[in-house]
């Protein structure tokens, strides 16, 4: 053994060839700060070996290196700029020394080589992959950019266009695509990976392969003519501006850095990468996006822990076809759980099957499946007008009309047709689960399962625990949701549960702004362009359906009369009374016409102004700051109340539910991350300016207490203690 660290070791393999093996104690290899330092020590040992002829890098895990240790990022981002820059210089000196070894090097990569793992691979002369490899640089998705030389080496290896596409979008590619673009040099079966890598090294050692020529382009300026450079970088900047926008500075920073570094050799190019990385690491956007990644891991880990002792349902059923039922049936069948879809109406069944077939055909058009797979999936959805097959199902989700009487009748009837251990769930969006449970003989086998539309796209499923729902029931439904590829978050029961409960105060803020003379177009523009929502409140209401919102608003008002009962007729009432239901009937805040692709396109409609004039004061202008404050304060207050009341268990789950269920702007990280970034005292000052608008603007006591003590909702993070010889970097 030449060297043994905590996460890697170095040993002779054969005849002057050494192997450096990443072998962390856990299930995966991560390139954390300690591993970078250990890698530097191992390379130091290699530099002393006079009989070294070649080096092979590999992993003892199912994945090469999954990336940097993202759990370190938030503390790393708190390190002062100068110190962080110094550490990056040290880390890059390690990869430079790997790249500069006086012998040929090869990385044998399997599973994943992402982020720092990819950058480690880029520092070797040759790269051999297994067919399951995913390789790429996802850093821009976390609000940063490659910091271990990825933005320098990849463009010089692949050419600017392919590298820019991967780096700016934070993409990873499979082994075949990596081979095609030159990111790897060969793809071999897993069992032949090490032998194949040794064979390449022997060829390089024997002079059959010119490893020095292979290495040289990575040390030099990017080979691009002035015209080629102008075209590549202009197109890339245009694409990034269009897709990422101003709220995500990392992609455009990465492109501009690669452009600026193009005319320099490795050392100066790495300095430019360093200078760009450090300021990005100190942005609120980076903290928010890393926070989302960590919260996502937490939520998925919680679901995994919850379901470790239950069997995932093998057969499911959906009550109520149509678009929603068809969407649920498709998602279940697509992920391998056969489903019976029941309705009392043949027309609805046809609609449900058509929806499932349409979604499968889209997969076929994209080349994700072939005709055989399509037929196989569709054959596992069984439409029925009766209860045939219900004696075999493990879980049933009810997705009928949003009416408590109808839902209770359907659930009570279904309970008599299934096994005693079958779990029932309701896809209600607002009706309390404990109320629906009153109709059942086995309420412990019942809970809520709230999907979001469109089912195949929206990642969140709210699992609602009723007063009598058993732990096993919750676990089974969480297991099914996870199997369907969704992110399940368990919440406690109340009108609207979590997501709709916090959405309707936001809509109330919108209605009050309209009442006070604001223009709905400006509100939408501000909430989309400035705050970052995917759609403004007026457009969102049109998409959700004015009739749906009108009904839900009444349910919420009955559930929380002190805050949500209004004493005036609002814009939602006015549009509902005029039969303007939004996209579903072509008239809402806008008029809708189908474009060439059959998608609804919004157009101005003068008639809506007369309707809104009935419920609004004369038009007046509001500042962007006031619009954002008046829209967001009611929502954030309600989010905090849900945490204080135990409706949602943690800030992490609340923020993920908002991001995955409502499209809360990811660069804000969710309501609690936004609160922590803003500071609770500053938020309190802002909210107090609008307390005169009513109870929705009154800040909960728990949040006032946080403001008094200057406490965040997320646990405070200490700056990282960086490992490595920074002075000699």
Curated annotation (Swiss-Prot):
Residues 311-729 are annotated as: 3-hydroxyacyl-CoA dehydrogenase. Pathway: Lipid metabolism; fatty acid beta-oxidation. GO terms for cellular component: fatty acid beta-oxidation multienzyme complex. GO terms for molecular function: 3-hydroxybutyryl-CoA epimerase activity; delta(3)-delta(2)-enoyl-CoA isomerase activity; enoyl-CoA hydratase activity; long-chain-3-hydroxyacyl-CoA dehydrogenase activity; NAD+ binding. Keywords: Fatty acid metabolism, Isomerase, Lipid degradation, Lipid metabolism, Lyase, Multifunctional enzyme, NAD, Oxidoreductase. Signal peptide: none annotated. It holds the Pfam family 3HCDH_N. Its EC number is 4.2.1.17, 5.1.2.3, 5.3.3.8, 1.1.1.35. NAD(+) binds at residues 324, 343, 400-402, 407, 429, 453. The keyword Nucleotidyltransferase does not apply. In the N-terminal section; belongs to the enoyl-CoA hydratase/isomerase family. In the C-terminal section; belongs to the 3-hydroxyacyl-CoA dehydrogenase family. NCBIfam families: FadB, PRK11730.1. HAMAP family: FadB. PANTHER family: TRIFUNCTIONAL ENZYME SUBUNIT ALPHA (PTHR43612), TRIFUNCTIONAL ENZYME SUBUNIT ALPHA, MITOCHONDRIAL (PTHR43612:SF3). Involved in the aerobic and anaerobic degradation of long-chain fatty acids via beta-oxidation cycle. Catalyzes the formation of 3-oxoacyl-CoA from enoyl-CoA via L-3-hydroxyacyl-CoA. It can also use D-3-hydroxyacyl-CoA and cis-3-enoyl-CoA as substrate. This is Fatty acid oxidation complex subunit alpha. It comes from Escherichia coli (strain SE11).
